[in-house]
Amino acid sequence: MTENKKLQIKEFFLLDKSEKEFWLTKIGESDWRAGKYLFKILSEGSFNQQYGEKSKVFLLTQGNNLISFCSFSERDEIPDTELTPWIGFVYTFPAFRGKRRIGKLIEYIYRLAKNQGFKQLYISTDQKGLYDNFGFSFLQTMTERWGGETLVYQMEIVHKDYSDIIGKTVRGTIDRPLGASHPRHKEMIYPINYGYVDGLFAGDGAEQDVYVFGTNQPLKTYEGKIIGVYHRLNDVEDKWIVALDDRPYSDQEILEAISFQEQYFMGELYR
C-alpha cells in the first residue's frame, strides 16, 4: 500500500534518464498553469538557463506517486533584484493536500540554503498568508517579469545554540505513553513515550515537551539526559530529546522515531 511507503525527496537532475522521463510525466499531470510551464522548460532543457545554472528541482514522492514538487533557484520571476535564493513552482497534488507535505521540501531546501551560507530564503506568490504556515513572513510587493504584482515572503535562516541545555538531566511526567493515541487525532499512535519537564515552561506557554528514548515500555514518569533539541521552524516550541540510557542514538534514528508527529511540521535537529 502506498500509505506504508516512506516519503522520499528526489533531486530531478540527479535522476537517470528513465526516472526523469517517469517523474517528468507526473509533473505534467499537475492541474496548475505554472506546473505545466515547469514541465515545458524541463522537457526543453531550458530550466537552468532561465533560473540559474545551480538551480534545482525537488520532488516529494511516495512509491510511484508524486506528492509535491518545487524548485530551489538562483533567480525567480522578478527581474533586477539581488534577492536570492528562491523557492518556486510550489505544488502539491490535490489527493495529498491537507497534511502540509510541501513543508518537507521547504525544510530540505532550508537546510541546503543554510549549508550554503545563505541568511534568508525567498518565495514569490499571489497567495496572501499561505506561507506564514511554513515559517515565512511578508517582505514586500514587487513587480514580476510580466508586469503584474507579486507578494514576496522571506524566511530567516537561523543558527540556534542549545549548548546550555544539551547534556543536562531532567525529570518529568509522561502524559502520552508509548502506545497511547493523540487526544485530538486518534489515528496517531505514540511509538515512544512523550511528556514534559515538570515546572519548566516553553514558548507556547505550556510545560516543555520531551520525546523519551531508551525504553520499549510505557512510562508514567521519567528521568534522563537531554541528547538533542528538535527546533520547529514553523511553530513557537522546541521538542527536547531525552535518553534514559547512554546509547549513542543517531540523528536518523531520532528523526525516524519522532516523524509520526513531526512530519506535520518543519524543523531541524540540534545535537
Predicted regions mapped to residue ranges:
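Conserved active-site alpha-helix within GNAT-family acetyltransferase domains
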Residues: K119, T125-E149
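Conserved beta-strand in the GNAT
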Residues: V57-L59, N65-R75, W86, Y91
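Short loop/turn motifs at secondary-structure junctions and domain boundaries
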Residues: N48-E53
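Hydrophobic N-terminal alpha-helices or hydrophobic patches in metabolic proteins across all domains
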Residues: H159-R271
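Conserved acetyl-CoA-binding loop-helix of GNAT-fold acetyltransferases
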Residues: T92, G98-R111
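Short amphipathic alpha-helix that is part of the acyltransferase structural core
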Residues: T2-S46, V57
